[in-house]
Amino acid sequence: MRLTDIEIEQALDNGSIVIEPRPSNDAISGVSVDVRLGGQFRVFKDHTAPFIDLSGPSTEVQAALDRVMSEIIEIPDGEAFFLHPGELALAVTYESVTLPADIVGWLDGRSSLARLGLMVHVTAHRIDPGWQGKIVLEFYNSGKLPLALRPRMTIGALNFERLSGPVARPYNKRKNAKYKDQQDAVASRISQD
């Protein structure tokens, strides 16, 4: 069952869900908590690589990713990152989230942003039980105009679902967890599969 606003506030109060900085009660509605955009981004650089062979040897996949992904781009508060039509960018939430082993989170984009062509997560919207860290956002502009994204703007909402019991392998305990404790706009680590 999805947690209600009352249950979300109780989980924040008792520390079973931790969101830092803690959201105001105005950011909690019905079944969700608003999250804001952080100031870190990554984009695909201009490159001459014709493709990335995702099934190739892991060293070759990683080398290709290193060639095409930018370093972290820091956008100060008050300034904007421009996402042009047809572009993909990675970013992070301003908030850091910690979930217990018996709660899964779900990230939803905002309808108002989707109506302008902004996809906030291309596919990955589940936040695993045991997650700890910032949430990477996979932006795609499917619209016709560049979109100005500013740090700390409301970018999406998290909702939470209590499981029938704690999972045996929470994310923060898995040895092969590729994005454990992430604080940055981490590029794909598919080469570690």
UniProtKB/Swiss-Prot annotation:
GO terms for biological process: dUMP biosynthetic process; dUTP biosynthetic process; nucleobase-containing small molecule interconversion. It comes from the Bacteria. Gene3D superfamilies: 2.70.40.10. It is an enzyme of class 3 (hydrolase). InterPro entries: dCTP_deaminase (IPR011962), dUTPase-like_sf (IPR036157), dUTPase_trimeric (IPR033704). Pathway: Pyrimidine metabolism; dUMP biosynthesis; dUMP from dCTP (dUTP route): step 1/2. It catalyses: dCTP + H2O + H(+) = dUTP + NH4(+). Its EC number is 3.5.4.13. Residues 173-193 are annotated as: Disordered. Keywords: Hydrolase, Nucleotide metabolism, Nucleotide-binding. DCTP binds at R110, S111, S112, L113, A114, R115, D128, V136, L137, E138, Y171, K178, Q182. The active site is at E138 (proton donor/acceptor). The keyword Protein biosynthesis does not apply. One of its GO terms (molecular function) is nucleotide binding. NCBIfam families: dCTP_deam. Belongs to the dCTP deaminase family. Homotrimer. Catalyzes the deamination of dCTP to dUTP. This is dCTP deaminase. It comes from Shewanella sp. (strain ANA-3). The lineage of its organism: Bacteria, Pseudomonadati, Pseudomonadota, Gammaproteobacteria, Alteromonadales. The gene is dcd.
